[in-house]
């Protein structure tokens, strides 16, 4: 009986564990998403201002020999929209402990994200201008190149969360990592919508 009392005293004397920090990864992803949105938004604003100045001077924005293809931009937009749907499916499946569908959704999301990159590369090839040829080409390459880099980061984020889900670390309401990856991906898709409209549609 004395031993039992001593054990109770020993265990009750231990310090309480540190409280868990809720949603740290989600908040970090939100801050990172906001930062990249400001950077890319600034570049698009500079692009729009330069375009307005050139057109106001009576010149064409796209110089002779340059072509901005609608096909590549539109395909890129459609591909990313589909990937946003599959990312939402990934998060939904994890929250409902539907692991087979979560793995399928993660794989499809990564596949669609990778498929977006060749559409941008094709647009660069069809542009007919090098990055150093004109200020217009430099801005187009800078904006679209930065967005491809963001997609690469988003794909890496999704891949890491997919492997964590495969290892059983993301389950039910504890799937904060999947929510964080999805948030970053949604912002990336929304940013491409801005880029697509400013460069491909408005030209």
Which stretches of residues belong to each language-model region?
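...captures the hydrophobic TM-helix bundle architecture rather than a specific catalytic motif
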Residues: 1-203
């Amino acid at each position: 009986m004395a031993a039992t009392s001593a054990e109770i005293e020993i265990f009750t004397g231990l310090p309480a564990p540190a409280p868990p920090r809720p949603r740290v990864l989600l908040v970090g992803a939100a801050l990172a998403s906001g930062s990249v949105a400001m950077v890319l938004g600034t570049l698009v604003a500079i692009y729009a201002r330069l375009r307005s100045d050139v057109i106001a001077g009576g010149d064409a924005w796209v110089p002779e020999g340059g072509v901005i293809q609608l096909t590549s931009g539109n395909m890129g937009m459609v591909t990313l929209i589909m990937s946003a749907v599959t990312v939402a499916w990934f998060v939904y499946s994890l929250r409902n402990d539907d692991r087979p569908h979560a793995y399928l959704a993660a794989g499809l999301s990564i596949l669609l994200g990778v498929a977006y990159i060749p559409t941008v590369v094709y647009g660069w090839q069809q542009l007919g201008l090098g990055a150093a040829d004109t200020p217009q080409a430099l801005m187009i390459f800078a904006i679209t190149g930065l967005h491809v880099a963001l997609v690469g980061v988003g794909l890496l984020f999704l891949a890491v969360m997919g492997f964590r889900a495969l290892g059983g670390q993301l389950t039910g309401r504890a799937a904060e990592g999947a929510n964080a990856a999805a948030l970053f991906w949604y912002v990336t898709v929304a940013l491409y919508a801005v880029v697509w409209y400013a460069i491909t549609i408005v030209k």
